C-alpha cells in the first residue's frame, strides 16, 4: 500500500465546490461518494464529474478513490460511468460473495476497499478480507452501523467502542489495513479526540466527512518530535541491554521487551 493513507475524506459526488475544497484539505485519500452523499437523481452527474475530480485530486497529491453503491443497487451503473480510480470502495458489504462479484466487475488495477456497515458484516470481517487479493484495506462505518445496532451516534462514540476494537483486531489478523469510522460532528476538538482514541486502539487510518478535519487528523497519525525521541530512547536502551546480555530494558519506569522494541523500530523506519 504505497503513499500515506492517514485520512480518507468522503466528498459528495455531484458537488464541484466540495471537490475543490477536498483538493485543498490535505487529505491523503479523497473519495467520490456515490452512495449516501449523492441522491439517485444526481448520480449520473457525479459519475460524469469523476474524471475531472480524480485529475484535480491527483494533482494535489491525493489518492483518487470512489465509493460505489452495492452492485445489486446502482453499483453496476456507477462502474460503467466513472473514470477508473486508484481505489474502489463499495458500501454495505456483508459477505465475501459481494467482494468476489465486485472484483469481477472492477476496473483492472484499482485496489478494493470493502465497507463494513452492519453487525452481519462485522462478524464476517475476516472472510471478507480474504475474499480478494486486491483488497488493501477495509473500512468500518459509523452511521449505518449505529442504525443497524439500534442505538444513537454520540460524540464520545461509546456505542461503537466494541465495533471499532473488534474490527481492528479482525483486520490486523487478516493482514489488511483497518480504516476507522468517521467522526460525524463538525467540531475539530472532538475530531482530534476521536482520532487519538482510534490511534490508541491501533488504527493508522481514519475516514472523515469534513475537510477541515483532515490536517488535524493527519497530525494525530504523524509521529511528532517527542514520539520519535521516545522511540529512539527505547531502541537505544534495549540494544544496550541486549549487548550486556539482558533480555529487557527499562525506560522511564516501563519494561521494554522485544514487541515494544520492534514497534519503536517500525515507527522510526516509517519516518526515515
Residue locations for each model-derived region?
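Expand to "…catalyze enediolate/carbanion chemistry for C-C bond making/breaking, isomerization
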Residues: 1-272
Amino acid at each position: 500500500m504505497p503513499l500515506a493513507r492517514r485520512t480518507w475524506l468522503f466528498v459528495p459526488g455531484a458537488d464541484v465546490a466540495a471537490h475543490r475544497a477536498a483538493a485543498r484539505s490535505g487529505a491523503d485519500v479523497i473519495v467520490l461518494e456515490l452512495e449516501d452523499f449523492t441522491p439517485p437523481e444526481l448520480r449520473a452527474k457525479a459519475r460524469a464529474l469523476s474524471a475531472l475530480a480524480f485529475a484535480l485530486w491527483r494533482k494535489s497529491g491525493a489518492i483518487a478513490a470512489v465509493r460505489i453503491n452495492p452492485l445489486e443497487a446502482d453499483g453496476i451503473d456507477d462502474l460503467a460511468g466513472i473514470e477508473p480510480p486508484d481505489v474502489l470502495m463499495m458500501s454495505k458489504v456483508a459477505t465475501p460473495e459481494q467482494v468476489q462479484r465486485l472484483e469481477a466487475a472492477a476496473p483492472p488495477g484499482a485496489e478494493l476497499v470493502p465497507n463494513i456497515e452492519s453487525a452481519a458484516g462485522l462478524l464476517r470481517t475476516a472472510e471478507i478480507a480474504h475474499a480478494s487479493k486486491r483488497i488493501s484495506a477495509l473500512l468500518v462505518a459509523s452511521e449505518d452501523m449505529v442504525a443497524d445496532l439500534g442505538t444513537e451516534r454520540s460524540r464520545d462514540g461509546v456505542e461503537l467502542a466494541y465495533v471499532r476494537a473488534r474490527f481492528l483486531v479482525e483486520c490486523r489478523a487478516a493482514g489488511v489495513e483497518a480504516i476507522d469510522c468517521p467522526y460525524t460532528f463538525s467540531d475539530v476538538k472532538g475530531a482530534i479526540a476521536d482520532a487519538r482514541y482510534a490511534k490508541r486502539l491501533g488504527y493508522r487510518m481514519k475516514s472523515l466527512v469534513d475537510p477541515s478535519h483532515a490536517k488535524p487528523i493527519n497530525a494525530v497519525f504523524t509521529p511528532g518530535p517527542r514520539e520519535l525521541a521516545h522511540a529512539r530512547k527505547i531502541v537505544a536502551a534495549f540494544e544496550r541491554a541486549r549487548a550486556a546480555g539482558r533480555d529487557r530494558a527499562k525506560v522511564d519506569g516501563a519494561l521494554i521487551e522485544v514487541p515494544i522494541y520492534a514497534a519503536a523500530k517500525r515507527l522510526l523506519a516509517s519516518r526515515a
